[in-house]
Amino acid sequence: MKRHGILNSQISKVLADLGHTDTIVIADCGLPIPAGVARIDLALELGTPSFVDVVRIVADDMAVEQVTLATEIKAANPVALEAVMKLDVPQDYVSHEAFKELTKQAKVIIRTGEATPYANVILHAGVIF
């Protein structure tokens, strides 16, 4: 059994397999998941686990080089935006429709129980050296 880091075996495997510039998505419970993109569904009930908690925990175990967010998060969800800003990496903003198109390229979408608008982020893998 692991002593530290993410205990979820699916998430641990995805993070270990990422290459530079690969992407994963952390999503609220309403984001559509494109056909062909792997899903790790953590949602237990509305709000659990939260977007903020999952972003914090995953980013703590991942080399994140950049994030992509929907522009709409700025006005609609300052709490989720603040959680992502704490990662202290460059941010790219696109429309929500463009964001959904970008999710088609993700290695995986991690679905949280979050039920607030635009609580979605694309994490771009960096390197550890």
Swiss-Prot record:
It catalyses: beta-D-ribopyranose = beta-D-ribofuranose. Keywords: Carbohydrate metabolism, Cytoplasm, Isomerase. GO terms for molecular function: D-ribose pyranase activity; intramolecular lyase activity; monosaccharide binding. The keyword Transmembrane helix does not apply. The active site is at 20 (proton donor). Catalyzes the interconversion of beta-pyran and beta-furan forms of D-ribose. Belongs to the RbsD / FucU family. RbsD subfamily. Homodecamer. This is D-ribose pyranase. The gene is rbsD.
